[in-house]
Amino acid sequence: MNGILSTTEVDSQAELSCPAPAKLNLFLHVVGRREDGYHLLQTVFRLVDFADQLHFGLRADGVIKLHTPTPGVPEEQDLCVRAAKLLQRESGTPWGANIFLEKRIPMGGGLGGGSSDAATTLLALNRLWKLGWRRNQLLKLAPELGADVPVFVFSENAFAEGIGEKLLPIALPPAWYLILTPPVHVSTAKVFSSKELTRNTIPIKIPPFSTEQGHNDLEPVVCASYPEVARHLEWLRQLEGARMAAMTGSGACVFAEFATESGARSALGKIPYGMKGFVAQGLDRHPLHDFAEQ
């Protein structure tokens, strides 16, 4: 474990420190497109123990204040602030919150960092404000914040359909991942609008299925436009002992799956000069799973 997946309560009434774990898409199929332009997907989300850390402090004046703004992102557009204000408005609570974010998950890499931060904000403030909201209530708010937010609120590894809102829990075998971070920023909108994108992959029937059946339909489009992603992925695919290698989301991050920590760390020690990466363990469920009742 990376040690950051800890949840602490200070004075149990006024402060919370909570992780926001990253996710991997073990496969991602584009199976159609709605009339409104949204793409219909099938994917398996795997939570991993590499995480941002968020700290929340109770405020009696109702103000939501982010003390660690992201450069270039107006505070009112920050996903943590939007999540806090949405929950505050929908619940009618008079409480506010101070929010501090320790960012570790690379931005724009397909690891779901911003979405995970938003979900952790919903789950943590549900606890801090003593709202007692059930998970299905929080899940109704999640799509307003982003397509990947629901799975983090769902708090389990999941098979997802639709635009990511139809979620079924899925049991996945223990695994460790070597995750590489190519030095490029992939435009998700550009990838989904590409004429080269396959949008008619035959849907997988569940159950049963195996992640080995899958692939990432976005991968060929991204690799053609971003050679660095292709180079990193090609290196992963020649590793001995890797059960699979793929791109997560719309990139740019790519990963290889191993059965053991030693296998993943051995591969990390072999990465070529100029490549960067880290090892993460697959989780069975979100560390804040119990912050909302089923």
UniProtKB/Swiss-Prot annotation:
Known pathway: Isoprenoid biosynthesis; isopentenyl diphosphate biosynthesis via DXP pathway; isopentenyl diphosphate from 1-deoxy-D-xylulose 5-phosphate: step 3/6
Chain positions recorded as ATP binding sites: P106, M107, G108, G109, G110, L111, G112, G113, G114, S115, S116
Cross-referenced InterPro entries: GHMP_kinase_C_dom (IPR013750), GHMP_kinase_C_sf (IPR036554), GHMP_kinase_N_dom (IPR006204), IspE (IPR004424), Ribosomal_Su5_D2-typ_SF (IPR020568), Ribsml_uS5_D2-typ_fold_subgr (IPR014721)
Entry's EC annotation: 2.7.1.148
A GO term for molecular function: ATP binding
UniProt-annotated catalytic positions: K23, D148
Keywords: ATP-binding, Isoprene biosynthesis, Kinase, Nucleotide-binding, Transferase
Keyword ATP-binding carried by entry: yes
Coiled coil (residue ranges): none
Record's catalysed reaction(s): 4-CDP-2-C-methyl-D-erythritol + ATP = 4-CDP-2-C-methyl-D-erythritol 2-phosphate + ADP + H(+)
GO biological process: isopentenyl diphosphate biosynthetic process, methylerythritol 4-phosphate pathway; terpenoid biosynthetic process
Enzyme class, UniProt record, top EC level: transferase
Pfam (any one): GHMP_kinases_N
Function: Catalyzes the phosphorylation of the position 2 hydroxy group of 4-diphosphocytidyl-2C-methyl-D-erythritol.
Sequence similarity: Belongs to the GHMP kinase family. IspE subfamily.
NCBIfam families given in the database record: ispE
Name of protein: 4-diphosphocytidyl-2-C-methyl-D-erythritol kinase
Gene: ispE
